[in-house]
């Protein structure tokens, strides 16, 4: 081994320890004047550091090779000139922080060293090489804590886990164990199903005496007797000995603790004998035995503490590693999900599994051994009690035993509440995942507030069970705290009634024993609760482990004479059942009303009363989870979807008949695709073109036959999957850098002009889902990736449809024909005019191959293909013309020569995705105040304080009452003392309940208000927030952080407050007994405070780093799962799995150190607490003024609370750590930037606004973010009522920015926009966006039904909605409702999957058109709405626009000149300004840019005049 850091840092790493890839990390620190670096030329010619030279920046540290096997740690300095220098760390002006430097009078001479340059350079944890002493006392983490005390820790500072505890080997073991257990269970179930296999002996005996034996045996074989693999047992297989040994260590610690009362008895007996001898004037006994007993007490307490903390490090360590193994295994499983599994377990649920469920398993692992050690500890204490006071202890013990079933009943109820709460948590997470992922369309449609109401409704149901959980936990805690006192009361009363006299030694030994029961009694219910939560979570996770996976890898045969061979292959899409949840029916009152979306648009007529608009129930709205669909197969959407359709006015009754779900299938596919050929797949909508491609790629279930490839594959999907990474990283996609191949791919995919426009060229960061790229740019990046990947076989799923026709033509010839020549290309396309250039054509008909051949062969056959060509012959010519038109539009400027330097990263761009906010140091000022304010602290804190004072008063008086009873302070009978003692105990129990209840209410109100405010502000945040913040980060706030404030923070605060109250009460009691105790308390308190402050500086940074790394993990998890089809088609599953493993391991560095430094602190604070107990024992031995009774009371009190001192510090730290999560979500709740008001009452426009549709832009300037340049630069134009305006211009000219400005997605920096004379900046955003409509370029749908997507808040009748479906061509225009419904795949209850995954792009565009028809506004914007659809869909959309929007004002941002020639005026944009604006005729005659466009597109004045005759 060679040290990566100096030995005094305590870190060394084996040379063969593998390093993990990670992003670069650097931190700069300015060195002071005394550490200036000097460089001078040495005699040996080597450069030396010169301390007299200019200042340098310390960039970080790295490990370098020094002559072979030896390694050396170098500090990297950067000179002002940019030159980097390296220097061994031993020679640097740094002082490695140590514990002593945290003392106020010991300061290091130099600053601490900087962090390593990257995560790769972090050393392996020194735990693996630490000696026994350092492991025993956790000294190995001290250097890290000292560094954290000296400066804020960075992620690169944190040690790597050793390879054996990496996520990869652990997840592999877990999956292997679960698979083995599943196999064993299946074998047992198979044997059990055989009637010849005898049932287990116990069942045979039981059923022989019960009626209906045969039926019982049958049920047992089919259902009750079946076994199922257990994930909990699989985890035990992986962590068996390490985890189980923790329990035995705890038993050792508990045994030491249970013996302490016997030592206390010896001390009290010695004190009583000493006092008696002193009173009688006899020789005083030697103090030696007393001091010896005090030392014995100290040693027992230290051993007990060591046992407890080493128990926790093993059990909690198991939790950390279990979480890592489960997350990695879940990710690996999810990457292999079949379509059916993805439908049953959507991404939102998976994110909830890895955030909430794994956290509950992790938490439970730390305490689960208490399920059996607590009863063992109780039994040992009970035996000692019986030995001490005989059978008088039995009533108290019996009371405890009677109360145990009550606790178990409470736990069962808690388990039920937790399960119900988790169900609603899943629903909330799923809804949030979809809404936040589609916020752009939500804002365009002004749906923020209605969706907010849905979220609040679900949250209210979730909080209903959380509230009950908090109340029950308060009750259980009060019972657990009170049980020892009430049991002691019963035992003492019995002891007194049986004619025994109370003796100090017996009293306080028994009290100490009963007090020792408090912790197991208090922890056991919590352990039961957490175990119940964990078992529930494990049960939910088992669905992931049991999910159906893609069973086989692609079959590759390089020797095959063809590229792809399909033999008798049939494929089918899976149908995922709609999730049913009876709990949804329990939404009543306002929640049901909210989820129903309010009242319908208008009351039905008298004849329509029986046919009222269907009110969408909560179950239908929220439960519309993935169902009966075929993601990825646009044409193959489910027909009917099996939903019952309500009858409606004007709709034939037969529409409402329930229809069977029709699953799309490809049948009997036999196909050979030659190597190096270009094969096109064509066919009508719904024929199975994309399905065939998905079947080839393994995304569609193959039911029969075989598919064989001759080489590697890649997929260019119709909807491109773009990662949150740079343009270059998206194109490379994990492949090695090859400069020439890379720039060739850029050129062939027509990305050169785009890279020059981007601020940082190919180093520009792309947001999630390619948010800052246009649809065409995303598709070109997608194509460039396929070209660069250099696979043998490339599947292209209609990639040209998203491109301008001119660009599409260029890419077809430059990329598909030329650059990929020699590769096997399979192209799905609707561009019929390109077919003469392909080698082979496959004609799909109704899920079968209709014809195969060359273009000429198929035309000559006069079959289906010839019919298709004949039917769309004119449109084929039109398509070629469109290409010329669009090429003219895009090339309407000077010819540009592309400079590679302009396309490369310059390293100076603004980062799109904002770095996650991280406060350094203590919690942000006001965090606790804001939390308490949210928790209604003004009212609740006084109530809580009052309950604490009352409870502690009862505690102190109850403790002293025993002393007074033993001393017979008042001449009263025993009944007097017994009655008051019992009353005090009951009063204490009641006070403790109200104390816990008050605390629970504060946490409940805080949870309600923080989440409400946070999601409200997020929903009303500007669009730039969603463009620059990863969805995974936002979801982390509303999953893990919300779970923290709902549950973890509540428990931590309750424990901290109750512990603090107990300590205060105990200190008051001890001060009354012996005031000198306060001196020892003051000294120890200073040491407590110093250790706590030393701990907190590193603890909070561990937590914050962990939170940030966890968000990164969740973001990667969500992002990669959304692109699983692309990942699998490229064969990159292993790389993404390794990336996820790396992220889990990186996060575990911070998380594991958080656990260890808690143990470091706990052990030291327990030692200080043991010293306090020792000091009380010495006071009892050495002080003559302390009576035996008071000494016994003091000893029993300090022993029972000595661990409470360390527990308090840990709980306060835990509260602070958990408050980090609250701080993060409160940042959203209080500080998140907001859009302009959505409602402005004083300037609310009339309900009919806009009624005319006039639009005026005056000197409009706009930028997307403050740090970016203007994209609109003084735009001025006027649009008349019902005028149709076509907008054209090159990419980046500002076309779409007009729409952004009109909808106020970004606010203007200058000028104004008026609609019907109303300045849009003066009206609320909701009024503005509700008054105008949009058909966006990328139509986004939400999971649910077709009804919920076009009329999500139930404002229209069924008749109106069916009429809309006809007008938007989603169903036929036949007069017969029955025919139109039965002959089309759509009805109002057709299930729509997440993001409309089971519809084609064209079908999604038609749904978007239907939305616009339902909204029926005076102003409509089409943002390149037909750019990504086929000719047939384009024709339908244009026909609907012409017929339905005659009297509407229309702004059409167009690619194709043909689509806007019939418009009233044409707006030509250039560089954010109006270049030309007039009628098509006048612009053509003006000889400007538009004339040039028309000339290049071969459009004549006659064409324009002909189009003018067709104007709206």
From Swiss-Prot:
It is a multi-pass membrane protein. One of its GO terms (molecular function) is ATP binding. ATP binds at residues 683-690, 1289-1296. One of its GO terms (biological process) is biological process involved in interaction with host. Residues 31-65 have a biased composition (Basic and acidic residues). Keywords: ATP-binding, Membrane, Nucleotide-binding, Secreted, Translocase, Transmembrane, Transmembrane helix, Transport, Virulence. One of its GO terms (cellular component) is extracellular vesicle. The keyword Nucleotide-binding applies. Gene3D superfamilies: ABC transporter type 1, transmembrane domain, P-loop containing nucleotide triphosphate hydrolases. Residues 651-871, 1255-1496 form the ABC transporter domain. Signal peptide: none annotated. InterPro entries: AAA+_ATPase (IPR003593), ABC1_TM_dom (IPR011527), ABC1_TM_sf (IPR036640), ABC_transporter-like_ATP-bd (IPR003439), ABC_transporter-like_CS (IPR017871), ABC_transporter_C-like (IPR050173), P-loop_NTPase (IPR027417). It is found in: Extracellular vesicle membrane; Secreted. PROSITE patterns: ABC_TM1F, ABC_TRANSPORTER_1, ABC_TRANSPORTER_2. Residues 246-533, 943-1217 form the ABC transmembrane type-1 domain. Residues 13-29 have a biased composition (Polar residues). Its EC number is 7.2.2.-. The chain crosses the membrane at residues 229-249, 288-308, 363-385, 475-495, 507-527, 937-957, 974-994, 1067-1087, 1167-1187. Residues 619-643 have a biased composition (Low complexity). Belongs to the ABC transporter superfamily. ABCC family. Conjugate transporter (TC 3.A.1.208) subfamily. This is ATP-dependent permease YOR1. It comes from Cryptococcus neoformans var. grubii serotype A (strain H99 / ATCC 208821 / CBS 10515 / FGSC 9487) (Filobasidiella neoformans var. grubii). The gene is YOR1.
């Amino acid at each position: 081994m060679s040290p990566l850091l100096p030995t005094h840092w305590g870190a060394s790493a084996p040379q063969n320890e593998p390093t993990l890839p990670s992003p670069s990390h650097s931190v700069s620190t300015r060195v002071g004047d005394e550490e200036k670096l000097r460089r001078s030329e040495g005699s040996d010619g080597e450069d030396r550091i010169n301390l007299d030279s200019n200042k340098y920046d310390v960039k970080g540290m790295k490990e370098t090779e020094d002559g072979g096997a030896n390694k050396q740690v170098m500090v990297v300095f950067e000179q002002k000139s940019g030159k980097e220098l390296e220097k061994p760390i031993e020679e640097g002006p740094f002082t490695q922080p140590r514990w002593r430097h945290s003392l106020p009078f010991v300061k290091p001479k130099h600053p601490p060293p900087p962090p390593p340059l990257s995560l790769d350079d972090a050393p392996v944890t020194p735990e693996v090489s630490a000696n026994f002493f350092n492991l025993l006392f956790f000294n190995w983490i001290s250097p890290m804590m000292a560094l954290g005390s000296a400066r804020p820790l960075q992620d690169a500072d944190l040690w790597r886990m050793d390879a054996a505890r990496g996520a990869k080997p652990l997840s592999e073991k877990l999956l292997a164990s679960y698979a083995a257990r599943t196999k064993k269970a299946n074998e047992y179930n198979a044997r059990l199903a055989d009637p010849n296999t005898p049932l287990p002996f116990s069942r045979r005996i039981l059923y022989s005496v019960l009626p209906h034996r045969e039926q019982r045996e049958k049920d047992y074989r089919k259902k009750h007797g079946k076994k199922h693999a257990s994930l909990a047992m699989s985890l035990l297989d992986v962590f068996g000995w390490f985890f189980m040994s923790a329990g035995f260590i705890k038993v050792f610690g508990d045994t030491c603790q249970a013996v302490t009362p016997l030592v206390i008895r010896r001390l009290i007996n010695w004190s009583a004998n000493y006092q008696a001898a002193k009173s009688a004037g006899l020789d005083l006994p030697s103090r030696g035995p007393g001091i010896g007993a005090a030392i014995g007490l100290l040693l027992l307490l230290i051993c007990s503490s060591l046992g407890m903390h080493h128990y926790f490090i093993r059990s909690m360590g198991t939790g950390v590693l279990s979480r890592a193994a489960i997350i990695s295994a879940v990710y690996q499983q999810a990457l292999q999900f079949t379509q059916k599994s993805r439908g049953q377990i959507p991404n939102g649920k998976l994110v909830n599994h890895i955030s909430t469920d794994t956290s509950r398993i992790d938490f439970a692992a730390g305490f689960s051994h208490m399920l059996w050690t607590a009863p063992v500890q109780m039994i040992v204490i009970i035996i000692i009690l019986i030995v001490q006071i005989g059978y008088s202890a039995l009533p108290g013990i019996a009371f405890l035993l009677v109360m145990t079933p009550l606790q178990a009943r409470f736990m069962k109820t808690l388990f039920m509440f937790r399960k119900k709460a988790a169900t609603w948590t899943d629903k909330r997470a799923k809804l949030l995942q979809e809404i936040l992922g589609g916020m752009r369309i939500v804002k365009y449609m002004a749906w923020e507030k209605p969706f907010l109401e849905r979220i609040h409704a679900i949250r209210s149901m979730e909080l209903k069970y959380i509230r009950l959980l908090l109340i029950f936990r308060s009750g259980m805690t009060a019972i657990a705290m009170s049980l020892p006192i009430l049991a002691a009361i019963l035992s003492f009363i019995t002891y007194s009634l049986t004619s025994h006299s109370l003796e100090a030694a017996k009293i306080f030994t028994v009290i100490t024993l009963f007090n020792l029961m408090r912790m197991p009694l208090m922890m056991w219910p919590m352990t039961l609760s957490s175990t119940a939560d964990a078992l529930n979570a494990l049960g939910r996770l088992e669905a992931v482990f049991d999910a159906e996976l893609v069973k086989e890898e692609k079959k590759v045969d390089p020797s095959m004479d063809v590229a792809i061979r399909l033999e008798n292959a049939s494929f089918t899409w899976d149908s995922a059942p709609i999730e049913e949840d009876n709990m949804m029916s329990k939404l009543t009152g306002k929640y049901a009303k909210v989820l129903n979306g309010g009242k319908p648009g208008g009351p039905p007529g008298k004849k329509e009363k029986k046919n009222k608009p269907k009110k969408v129930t909560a179950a239908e709205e929220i439960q519309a989870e993935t169902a009966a669909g075929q993601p990825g197969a646009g044409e193959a959407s489910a027909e009917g979807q099996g939903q019952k359709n309500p009858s409606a006015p004007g709709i034939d009754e037969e529409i409402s008949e329930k229809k069977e779900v029709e699953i799309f299938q490809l049948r009997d596919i036999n196909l050979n695709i030659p190597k190096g050929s270009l094969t096109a797949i064509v066919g009508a909508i719904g024929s199975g073109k994309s399905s065939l491609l998905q079947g080839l790629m393994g995304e569609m279930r193959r039911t029969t036959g075989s598919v064989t490839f001759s080489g590697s594959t890649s997929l260019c999907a119709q909807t491109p999957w773009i990662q949150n990474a740079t343009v270059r990283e998206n194109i490379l996609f994990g492949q090695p850098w090859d400069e020439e191949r890379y720039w060739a791919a850029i050129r062939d995919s027509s990305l050169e002009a785009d890279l020059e426009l981007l601020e940082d060229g190919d180093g520009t960061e792309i947001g999630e889902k390619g948010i800052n790229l246009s649809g065409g740019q995303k598709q070109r990046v997608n194509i460039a990736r396929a070209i660069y990947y250099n696979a043998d076989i490339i599947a292209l799923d209609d990639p040209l449809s998203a491109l301008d026709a001119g660009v599409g033509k260029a890419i077809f010839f430059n990329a598909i024909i030329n650059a990929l020549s020699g590769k096997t290309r399979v192209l799905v396309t609707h561009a019929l005019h390109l077919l003469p250039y392909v080698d082979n054509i496959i004609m799909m008909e109704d899920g079968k191959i209709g014809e195969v051949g060359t273009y000429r062969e198929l035309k000559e056959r006069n079959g289906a293909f010839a019919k298709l060509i004949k039917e769309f012959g004119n449109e084929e010519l039109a398509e070629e013309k469109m290409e010329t038109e669009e090429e003219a539009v895009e090339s309407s400027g000077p010819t540009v020569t592309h400079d590679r330097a302009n396309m490369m990263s310059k390293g100076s761009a603004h980062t799109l995705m904002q770095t996650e906010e991280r406060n350094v140091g203590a919690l942000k000022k006001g965090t606790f105040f804001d939390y308490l304010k949210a928790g209604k602290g003004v009212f609740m804190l006084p109530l809580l304080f009052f309950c604490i004072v009352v409870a502690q008063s009862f505690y102190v008086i109850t403790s002293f009452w025993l002393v007074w009873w033993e001393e017979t302070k008042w001449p009263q009978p025993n009944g007097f003392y017994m009655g008051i003692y019992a009353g005090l105990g009951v009063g204490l129990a009641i006070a403790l309940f109200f104390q816990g209840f008050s605390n629970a209410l504060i946490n409940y109100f805080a949870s309600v208000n923080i989440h409400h405010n946070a999601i409200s502000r997020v929903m009303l945040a500007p669009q730039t927030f969603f463009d620059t913040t990863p969805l995974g980060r936002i979801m982390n706030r509303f999953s893990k952080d919300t779970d923290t404030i709902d549950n973890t923070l509540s428990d931590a605060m309750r424990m901290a407050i109750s512990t603090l109250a107990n300590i205060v009460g105990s200190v008051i009691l001890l001060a009354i007994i012996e005031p000198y105790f306060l001196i020892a308390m003051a000294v120890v308190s200073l040491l407590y405070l110093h250790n706590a402050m030393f701990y907190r500086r590193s603890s909070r940074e561990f937590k914050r780093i962990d939170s940030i790394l966890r968000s990164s993990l969740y973001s990667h998890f969500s992002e990669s799962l959304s692109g699983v089809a692309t990942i699998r088609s490229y064969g990159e599953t292993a790389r993404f799995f390794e990336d996820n493993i790396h992220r889990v391991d990186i996060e575990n560095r911070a998380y594991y150190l958080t656990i260890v430094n808690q143990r470091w602190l706990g052990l030291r604070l327990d030692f200080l607490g043991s010293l306090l107990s020792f000091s009380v024992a010495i006071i009892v031995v050495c002080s003559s003024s302390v009576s035996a009774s008071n000494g016994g009371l003091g000893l029993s009190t300090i022993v029972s609370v000595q661990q409470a001192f360390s527990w308090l510090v840990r709980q306060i730290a835990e509260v602070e750590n958990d408050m980090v999560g609250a701080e993060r979500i409160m940042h959203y709740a209080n500080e998140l930037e907001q859009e302009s008001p959505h409602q402005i009452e004083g300037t609310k426009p009339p309900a009919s606004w806009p009624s005319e549709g006039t639009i005026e832009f005056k000197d409009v300037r706009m930028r997307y973010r403050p740090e970016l340049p203007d994209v609109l630069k003084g735009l001025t134009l006027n649009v008349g009522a019902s005028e149709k305006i076509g907008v054209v211009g090159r990419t980046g000219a500002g076309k779409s920015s007009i729409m952004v400005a009109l909808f106020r997605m970004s606010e203007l920096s200058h000028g104004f926009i008026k609609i019907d004379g109303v300045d849009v900046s003066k009206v609320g955003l909701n009024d503005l966006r509700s008054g105008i409509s949009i058909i966006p370029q990328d139509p986004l749908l939400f999971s649910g039904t077709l009804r919920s997507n076009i009329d999500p808040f139930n404002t229209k009748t069924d008749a109106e909605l069916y009429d809309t479906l006809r007008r938007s061509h989603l169903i036929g225009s036949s007069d017969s409702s029955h025919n139109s419904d039965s002959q089309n795949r759509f009805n109002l209850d057709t299930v729509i999957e997440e993001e409309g995954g089971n519809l084609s792009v064209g079908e999604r565009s038609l749904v978007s058109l239907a939305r616009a028809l339902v909204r029926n506004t005076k102003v409509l914007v089409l943002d390149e709405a037909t750019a990504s659809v086929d000719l047939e869909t384009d024709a339908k959309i244009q026909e609907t626009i012409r017929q339905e929007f005659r009297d509407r004002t229309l702004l059409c941002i167009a690619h194709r000149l043909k689509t806007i020639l019939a418009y009233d005026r044409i707006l030509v944009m250039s560089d954010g300004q109006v270049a030309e604006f007039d009628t098509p005729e006048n612009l053509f005659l003006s000889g400007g840019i538009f004339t040039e466009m028309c000339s290049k597109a071969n459009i004549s004045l006659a064409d324009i005049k002909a189009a003018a005759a067709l104007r709206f």
